[in-house]
């Protein structure tokens, strides 16, 4: 295409020269016209070659990076992990990224043992985990939504009401201005990052009276959606229209409110490594560079999470 444009430009210049001569222009004016056209063509060729060189360099960089990255951990981070893996492998075809969703604590145990490169955790690391050499790399911020079944008329709860519900002090929705129906308290299993973060933020650690303890985010949402009077909690980015996300202290669970600090149920999404990022292999380092780039942040935002600086 560039060659065709170059030929057309030179033909046009020749035609203009002939026209000028026919109109009585001097041979110097005609020569100047041809020289200007040649300079334009040369500049266009140089710009095109520079663009091609940049594209080839980018492709070469992608082709040069190879290897595998293994992740395990939080079920709440499944959507993020899958999106990052897909986009990163598209950018670097020589890289394979695998992810297992076994729960935050299991992910931290795996990275501590060296059986995976990255342990995904939807809670902050504990001091004993850090003492074992695991480094907390926060890649995004997530909100935790309190969800009720769609027919529930109670749409707003205070922190004190949440405490009373989850400790079993409040047992009927009528006590909160709702229908005369028993409250069915749904939660996650022990070791879940979502459960740990929720209980810590609400102030009900090891004090919850659960009717059901489920092993995944999807299971909690499905149970609440199908159980009259149910209440549960789940990652904000996983909420769908089968449940109602309640406001807390009059504040809706939205990205804007979490960024503003007005919604109190939020937590970090951590991609933990054994040692600092700089100590990891080239492929793992490239993944973290990607997450910090504009392209990586777009992936994070695309799954409903809040990016970090």
Locations of regions flagged by a protein language model:
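Short extracytoplasmic/periplasmic juxtamembrane "stem" segments immediately C-terminal to an N-terminal membrane anchor
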Residues: 36-44
